[in-house]
Amino acid sequence: MEPDGYVEELPGTILIYKENQYAASEHSVLKKDGDIVLQPQPSDDPNDPLNWNKFRKNWHLVLICLVSLVTGAIANDAGSAQDQMNAELGISYDAMDNAAGVLFICVGYFTYLAMPATFLYGRRCVYLVCLLFGMLGSMWFALVKTTSNSIGNQAFIGISEACAEALTQFSVSEVFFEHERGIKIGIYILSTSVGTYLGPLAAGYIASSQGWRWIGWWGLIISGITFVLFLFTFEETTFDRAAAIDRKQIQISNDQLTVKEDFDLKDMQSDIKPDVEKSDAMDDSKMKVDYTVNEISNAVQPIYSKPSYWKRIALITPANSLSGIGFRQYIMRLFQTLRIFLFPAVLYSGLQWGAQDAWLSFYLTTEEEDWMEAPYNYGDNAVAIMNVPCIIGATIGCIYGGYFGDYFTLWAAKRNNGIKEAESRLWLMILPCIINPIGLFMFGIGTARHWHWGPTYVGLGFIGFGWGCAGDISMAYLMDAYPGMVLEAMVGVSVINNTFGYVFTFACQSWIDSLGTERTYISIGVLCFIFIATSFPMILCGKRLRKWTAKQYYTFLNVRNRLDEKIPDQDRRGQDGVESR
């Protein structure tokens, strides 16, 4: 271990409490919130998003959740119009299934294609482009006349949801500290759940009262309002924190001595007296060092200027390293991002979130088929109301995985000498590992045997609980494990997740037809248990896997940072190794 709070060069293992003997020094330079060491360490620049006041941070989160809710709703409302579209336009149900598959593909792979633009041109432009596609897709849906139209508009709507699949989590990580992210990701998952489950409910009422085309018109109106809010109130969060910290220095007039934040020994002069003390917990080569600055006079504090409102909401915020229009950098980043699929934590998180999308295809299909026939004889509105138990369960799951998850990881860190391990969060997967499969069993078996609606609705609530917390916990774990590549990691999760959704969109109906409802839900309940149970190997071996991939992780970051460099004939002196976003 190293002094001044640097635990070891292992991603996902961080010092979170100052009681740790290497950070408890009175003169420690680590910034804290009470006893909690802030991770990542913010700069002193008030323009750093980590230093924003609570209102700016919370409004940023509100907009992130709003775009997740809106895009989730318009991506799931087409099913409420299927019967009327079939009767009026003759569009087959198979064509509508194809449209749903196209939507999943566009969500996952446009997330991948948009990722480099986030670094090169800023976050705002990606959000705005996606919302624009949502507006166009909704309008196209309202004007559908042919089968090709019905597929094309879903492609546009899929592109719109891409911003809510990876960029939203990245935005959370830019504004909130690591010990705050679990609950924030939980709120994001809850917003996605509200859109996913209540979007079809609202669309069903719109279709029955105003006609199915008004689903598209209302989607256009709500997406348009969201677009305007983002255009004028969503601030750009591009900030080169590493460069800002490197620039910070204190001038000591007596000796003209510069003391850098990293307290590099070669910069220390006679006015700084080292007090070296051997620690039993350290190797012979490692020492605990407390530096006492006798006198710092006439210190020159840096002057920070706040960007104007119009600069903070600029349509494009080009990276400092942008060369020309950035085409070469864009292509190189696309290829670089493919490396994320070599990280086990990315595959694990993608599996958890993708499985939830897969089960969604099954129970939505069952609701629309079995529950609209005898003995239930539900209508469109009654089927839509079946999503209410899911949203209740998802709300509880998000509170469990988010708020309680953050509390649990801090509690575990206190018991570990102030050291927080990423895998501590995965202990919370025990509950969904039990509850989620039980929910699938209750709903599937209850539907097949025509149980009273009560137990089957409870089953839907259990399924919603799994939806709410499995994705929250696994994605928060991934963000903790590899904090330097949050966006790229979430892109990987999105690709895996939506590939699952695409495959099971076509597989679920054949599965149900061949096995029957009861046996199908028994089989996917077992699969659900197996998928979530992969959390236990991650708990036991996750740290070992992080050690195994640590070199690969830092190589990934170094290569990415080199991609940020301008072409050789442009001067980048002093910027080597600093990521410019």
Swiss-Prot record:
This is Uncharacterized MFS-type transporter C1271.10c. One of its GO terms (molecular function) is transmembrane transporter activity. The keyword Secreted does not apply. It is found in: Cytoplasm, Cell cortex; Membrane. One of its GO terms (cellular component) is cell cortex. Its main location: cytoplasm. GO terms for biological process: transmembrane transport. Belongs to the major facilitator superfamily. SUPFAM superfamilies: MFS general substrate transporter. The modification Phosphoserine is found at residue 28. InterPro entries: MFS (IPR011701), MFS_dom (IPR020846), MFS_trans_sf (IPR036259). Pfam families: MFS_1 (PF07690). PANTHER family: MAJOR FACILITATOR SUPERFAMILY (PTHR23502), PROTEIN HOL1 (PTHR23502:SF34). It is a multi-pass membrane protein. The chain crosses the membrane at residues 61-81, 100-120, 125-145, 187-207, 214-234, 340-360, 382-402, 426-446, 458-478, 486-506, 522-542.
